[in-house]
Amino acid sequence: MNRSEPISLADVAGEEKVQVLRDRVQVALGRKEATLLLKNCRLVNVYSKEIYRTDIAVWGDRIVSITPGAVTEAREVIDCTDYYAMPGMIDPHMHVDTTMLWPNELARVLVPRGTTTVFVDMVNIAHNAGAEAVSELMKAFKGVPLRAYF
């Protein structure tokens, strides 16, 4: 490819990923059916400290719209009039080893209560059990519905 030729998003990301992005935009614009529509929920905006009524449209595994009324068609619609929605919480410093829980059990406790991400401090396990234990703990987080950064 000549450097003077324009590069498209498909050249960089691949056509399949570009199509996924196009589909998300179409759902957000109300031109394509969403997977899930949460109607009339109270959205907690953690930046502005506001709580307001809105609809949340999901396509696949992504939120594509939080604009009230923008998306009207969905495979599943849930009336969330009595519910709140908020971003997942992040624990910025956690010693997983001192919880005495393996990652799948830790996720079972944290995720339903809103924590979706943890930053894991490995100093104790590294000092007491060594590199192999650190590696095993990191592997144990694979496939667990709790995002972990080490």
Which ranges hold each PLM region?
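Divalent-metal coordination cores built from histidine and acidic residues
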Residues: N2-A28, L106-F150
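Histidine-rich, glycine-flanked metal-binding segment
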Residues: A13-L37, R42-P87
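Alpha-helix N-cap/helix-start motif
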Residues: I51, T99, H127-G130
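Short, low-complexity, polar/charged sequence segments that are solvent-exposed and flexible
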Residues: D55-V64, V96-D97, A107-V111, M138-K139
